Amino acid sequence: MNWELCDDYPSKAPPETCNKVDGARRCRTSCNNEGYGGANCNLKGKVKVCECTILRVCLPHHKRPPHVPKPPK
């Protein structure tokens, strides 16, 4: 079985998530709900984007949830 590295994966949370007052908290919550270990609100251009960091469980590619992309080579 080929296990993938536990790289950072972007969240599917909308960019507006981090622009609200409680955005960072919602960002963390949505990342945790998706099975990620943490979250960052990173400035991308003029919007802060919710990005999840480090999958809590390192899944082989074929067992990953469909919204989790394979890491770029």
Swiss-Prot record:
<dbReference type="GO" id="GO:0031640">
    <property type="term" value="P:killing of cells of another organism"/>
</dbReference>
<keyword id="KW-0611">Plant defense</keyword>
<keyword id="KW-0929">Antimicrobial</keyword>
<dbReference type="GO" id="GO:0050832">
    <property type="term" value="P:defense response to fungus"/>
</dbReference>
<comment type="similarity">
    <text>Belongs to the DEFL family.</text>
</comment>
<feature type="disulfide bond">
    <location>
        <begin position="6"/>
        <end position="58"/>
    </location>
</feature>
<keyword id="KW-0295">Fungicide</keyword>
<feature type="disulfide bond">
    <location>
        <begin position="18"/>
        <end position="41"/>
    </location>
</feature>
<keyword id="KW-1015">Disulfide bond</keyword>
<feature type="disulfide bond">
    <location>
        <begin position="31"/>
        <end position="52"/>
    </location>
</feature>
<feature type="disulfide bond">
    <location>
        <begin position="27"/>
        <end position="50"/>
    </location>
</feature>
<protein>
    <recommendedName>
        <fullName>Putative defensin-like protein 42</fullName>
    </recommendedName>
</protein>
